[in-house]
């Protein structure tokens, strides 16, 4: 569950959160310090909508505005000695390698500022955890200058690891662990209510090696004394991790590489892929990206919350007519605020847009008690983002035996860190126009946008709309392309219709029938079907 509903609901939660749950806004040593008092000149330049949103926030939560910091508290951790690890890859060593180019000139073997990074690697004994029989590695990427430590867990392909592609999986939030994707969606196993490991025959490592990464820092098993609060900053760390990982394991570097994720990964993935492609000399063979039920172009996607909640997305209405009309009435102001955010990309305009729009367009649905990740179901466990299985996963991962087997250095695991969620929101990251990066990707690699059609929070209507509207060289032909049936082709259910797909050039949109926010959870067979065919280059 790459980008959990809690991610998108931050604005709603902030607008409706009870006073005992303070909003964390930065104060000391921050440009945000007492924003409505100390930045009066900036405030005067805001539009009326943005001013009103800030005033409403300050009135509702005066103590929060003035007293709380934006940074998440560091996780308790104990660093393991270097002797614990099988390998430590020094970024400074990799950075110092020079080679002779085709033109006879000396150049660095790989680009990028890697001196401050190290990668620690430990082989995971498959027999200790019983997740899968394949070769596994876990460890940390260390940013020594900024005290950041990102946790990863690698699973080799069950099929042909010497030739199968490598995939990086990212959950969203922002602030949610990618181990959710591992155990709830597409990894080699799940965890049942008795904390037993259950084999997943539809795991995405059936025909690909998969890296699950907890990012940004202070998410899952990752930790830091500092913080990352925007998508751009997170991209540098991901590039460093992949570069050092493939340096340690060159046998995987020759394979095709893909980045996949969901929800807020609709922000992450375009930026991370762009960061990789910006380096001419690299050891990352990036071929495509896959974004599932993502948030990428809010201006185009937010108008589709009302239709999805009101019976126009292929499922019965969740909201009554009066509430639907109220959402329609709120939409113009919402879109005006997002347009201002797009024009300036200033937190002072993007934050009010997030707060107002999430309250107006997502809040009414959230208050029904229906699962925002699946319009067909009630939210069964609000504390675990509507899925009780997340509680089992969290309990299993918090076992000392599990942490020791993985070389974990933090004292506890949480599936989501809502401090990180708020940090990204209050830096204006939520509403920024990351779709503008996508045309540059399409020029170089394949891009898949897929969407389970029962999701509300990042629904298929909005994802189809932004892909049709995207400004790129093939826009007109893509928008006119026919949505064709997507059917199973390679097992006993051959011919079963699992969705719709359209494609032109390097750009593909896919609607998956019966899938919620987490397609691999709801439709595991269909998920593995399209995934394998995408990696095979069918679209």
From Swiss-Prot:
Q: What class of enzyme is it?
A: hydrolase
GO biological process, alphabetically ordered: proteolysis
Q: Which Pfam families match?
A: Carbpep_Y_N, Peptidase_S10
Q: Which gene encodes it?
A: cpyA
Q: Which reaction does it catalyse?
A: Release of a C-terminal amino acid with broad specificity
Give me the Gene Ontology terms describing cellular component. fungal-type vacuole
Which cysteine pairs make disulfide bonds?
Answer: 176-416, 310-324, 334-357, 341-350, 379-386
The record's family statement is:
Belongs to the peptidase S10 family.
**Name of the molecule in the record:** Carboxypeptidase Y homolog A
Q: What subcellular locations does the record give?
A: Vacuole
């Amino acid at each position: 569950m790459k980008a959990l509903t809690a991610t998108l609901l931050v604005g709603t939660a902030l607008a409706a959160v009870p006073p005992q749950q303070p909003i964390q806004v930065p104060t000391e040593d921050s440009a945000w310090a007492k924003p409505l008092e100390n930045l009066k000149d900036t405030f005067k330049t805001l539009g009326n909508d943005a001013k009103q949103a800030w005033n409403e926030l300050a009135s509702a939560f005066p103590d929060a505005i003035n007293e709380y910091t934006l940074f998440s508290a560091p996780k308790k951790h104990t660093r393991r000695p270097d002797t614990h690890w099988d390998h430590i890859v020094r970024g400074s060593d990799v950075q110092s390698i020079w080679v002779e180019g085709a033109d006879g000139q000396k150049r660095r073997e790989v680009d990028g500022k890697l001196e401050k990074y190290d990668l620690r690697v430990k082989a995971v004994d498959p027999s200790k955890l019983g997740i899968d029989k394949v070769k596994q590695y876990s460890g940390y990427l260390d940013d020594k200058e900024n005290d950041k430590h990102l946790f990863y867990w690698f699973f080799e392909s069950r099929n042909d690891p010497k030739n199968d592609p490598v995939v990086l999986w990212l959950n969203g939030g922002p602030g949610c662990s990618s181990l959710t994707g591992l155990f709830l969606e597409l990894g080699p196993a799940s965890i049942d209510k008795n904390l037993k490991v259950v084999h997943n025959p539809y795991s995405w490592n059936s025909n690909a090696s998969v890296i699950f990464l907890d990012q940004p820092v202070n998410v899952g098993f990752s930790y830091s004394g500092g913080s990352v609060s925007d998508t751009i900053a997170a991209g540098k760390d991901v590039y460093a991790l992949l570069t050092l990982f493939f340096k340690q394991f060159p046998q995987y570097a020759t394979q095709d590489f893909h980045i996949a994720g969901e929800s807020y990964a609709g922000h992450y993935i375009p930026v991370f892929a762009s960061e990789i492609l910006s380096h001419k000399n690299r050891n990352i063979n990036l071929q495509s990206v896959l974004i599932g039920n993502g948030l990428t172009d809010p201006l185009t996607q937010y108008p589709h919350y009302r239709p999805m909640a009101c019976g126009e997305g292929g499922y019965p209405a969740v909201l009554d007519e009066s509430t639907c009309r109220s959402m329609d009435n709120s939409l113009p102001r919402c879109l005006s605020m997002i347009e201002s955010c797009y024009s300036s990309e200033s937190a002072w305009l993007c934050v009010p847009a997030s707060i107002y729009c999430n309250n107006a367009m997502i809040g009414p649905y959230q208050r029904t008690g229906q699962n925002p990740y699946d319009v067909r179901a009630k939210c069964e466990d609000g504390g675990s983002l509507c899925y009780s299985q997340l509680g089992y996963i969290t309990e299993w991962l918090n076992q000392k035996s599990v942490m020791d087997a993985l070389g974990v250095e933090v004292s506890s695991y949480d599936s989501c860190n809502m401090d990180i969620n708020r940090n990204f929101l209050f830096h204006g990251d939520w509403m920024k126009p990351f779709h503008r990066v996508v045309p540059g990707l399409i020029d170089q690699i394949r891009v898949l946008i897929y969407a389970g059609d029962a999701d509300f929070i990042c629904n298929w209507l909005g994802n189809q709309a932004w892909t049709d509207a995207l400004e790129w060289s093939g826009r007109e032909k893509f928008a006119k392309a026919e949505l064709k049936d997507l059917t199973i082709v390679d097992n006993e259910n051959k011919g079963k219709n699992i969705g719709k797909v359209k494609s032109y050039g390097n750009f593909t949109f896919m609607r998956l029938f019966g899938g919620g926010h987490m397609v691999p959870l709801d439709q595991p067979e269909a998920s593995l079907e399209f995934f394998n065919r995408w990696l095979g280059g069918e679209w």
